[in-house]
Amino acid sequence: IDNWSVEKIKKAGGDAVKVLAWYRPDAEKKSLEYQQQYVQRIGEECEKYSIPFLLELLVYPFQDDDHHTKEYIEQKQKKSQHVIDSVKEFAKEKYKVDIFKLEAPVDSNDLEGDISKETEDAFKNLAKATNNKPWVVLSSGMGKTSFYKCLELAYQNGASGYLAGRTIWLDAFKNYPNIENVDKGLKTESVSY
């Protein structure tokens, strides 16, 4: 955001700095270096001003990938290793990340029905990649049943919680502009998380 900085956030009374970084470990070297320097610079500023740094990492699709979209929706057929390798990179001490906000390392379709060993292993490897830093999971707008399973696997592997949006509140907000029904939806369906 123009005219904002870690220093300004701290002086304004912020409790933490949250940054979203779109990353793809198999991207061009120049892009990777730019993204890494950007995150490192923010981490150094957070350390300087003694404010926690929460990094949200999302793997982006290349232009010619199947299911490419300009909207942020869960990337179908994402590769677990891309998610895991991205986390491994930013778990290095030089980035000074205090907590991660991470997407599931698998497609939400892999969270329906019986869970495969590959899916279980992907969550284990995601947890290892954090280098023992706290992490929370995001919903990527996946369905509620898949998100419950995602939370189950994340918690079994050491996740500290979740920071999720659409999966939890979207159904309630479909009642807008009827604020009474929005409120009711938030107090019933959304609370179960």
Give the label of every model feature segment.
Residues 99, 103-193:
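Catalytic-face loop-and-helix region of soluble metabolic enzyme cores
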